[in-house]
């Protein structure tokens, strides 16, 4: 298996088709890559594994399948690298599961499944697929077709634009700019300004702690929760649905709480503005997977089976 001396973070580039990829970032001084056929009895799988190129130069690791694998996955790739390394992944009918702390992450996904633990920032173009990230310590810029996106927590501003699908964020600490032709937007907690527009889809802000929310859709419900005691300005309307506003006026708002503003418009849907308790919900890891989801990916390489650096 290729092993390279890497005393610090590196830049990893993965370009694969029909592959299962597992990346483990940890406190280590080398990078190890293991490539195996998913089915060792399959000539086509063996060929894909044999033709997979692994190169390292100038602090940059490149792993590339030169022969496309089958949609179910022909090759299993395990990469162990130093924590803080950046990752750029170009994927077609492939899945990637990354554990540990990565730096900046770039995703180009034609189709497939991505699970990331912690990244320092995200740039993504997704045609279709399912992406889940536990924590983004920085900004995120995401665009593409119809896909599912789940982010447990993000500290920087988020810009998301797509044609459809579903988007969920557990805790957004900064501003959100969300637009779609037909995506449901579901935000558990938002601490900054929000602009969300979708032609057809529901918009839910479980808890808006401060800032301005401008929420517009053609069809679908709009729901916003505002902390008890927080002063709020509410301007909402539905052309063909009902409006339930239990927040509009509060006799004695807490002056220490930030003021929020909500502007919401829908044609075919209900608008619900309500008070919510100042309680943080428990959030499980969004990157949890079924045991068989990545069963073909080889486990992380241990010191016992590493080859000598070359």
What are these regions (language model features)?
Residues 1-310:
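Intrinsically disordered, low-complexity terminal regions
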């Amino acid at each position: 298996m290729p092993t390279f001396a890497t005393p610090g973070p590196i830049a990893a580039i993965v370009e694969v088709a029909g592959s299962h990829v597992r990346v483990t970032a940890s406190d280590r001084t080398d990078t190890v890559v293991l490539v195996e056929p998913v089915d060792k009895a399959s000539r086509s799988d063996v060929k894909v594994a044999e033709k997979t190129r692994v190169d390292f130069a100038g602090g940059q690791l490149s792993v590339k399948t030169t022969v496309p694998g089958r949609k179910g996955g022909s090759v299993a790739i395990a990469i162990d690298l130093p924590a803080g390394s950046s990752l750029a992944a170009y994927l077609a009918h492939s899945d990637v599961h990354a554990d540990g702390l990565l730096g900046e992450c770039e995703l180009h996904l034609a189709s497939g499944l991505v699970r990331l633990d912690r990244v320092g920032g995200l740039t993504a173009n997704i045609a279709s697929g399912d992406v889940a990230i536990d924590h983004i310590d920085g900004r995120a810029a995401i665009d593409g077709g119809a896909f599912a996106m789940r982010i447990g927590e993000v500290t920087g501003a988020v810009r998301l634009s797509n044609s459809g699908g579903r988007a969920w964020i557990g805790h957004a600490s900064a501003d959100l700019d969300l637009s779609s032709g037909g995506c449901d937007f579901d935000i558990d907690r938002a601490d900054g300004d929000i602009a969300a527009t979708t032609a057809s889809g529901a918009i839910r802000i479980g808890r808006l702690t401060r800032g301005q929310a401008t929420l517009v859709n053609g069809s679908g419900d709009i729901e916003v929760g505002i902390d008890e005691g927080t002063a709020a300005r509410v301007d909402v309307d539905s052309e063909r649905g009902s409006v339930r506003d239990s927040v509009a006026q509060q006799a004695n708002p807490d002056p220490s709480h930030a003021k929020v503003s909500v502007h919401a418009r829908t044609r075919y849907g209900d608008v619900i503005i309500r008070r919510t308790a100042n309680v943080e919900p428990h959030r499980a890891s969004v990157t949890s997977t079924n045991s068989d989801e990545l069963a073909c990916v080889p486990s992380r390489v241990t010191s016992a089976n590493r080859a000598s650096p070359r």
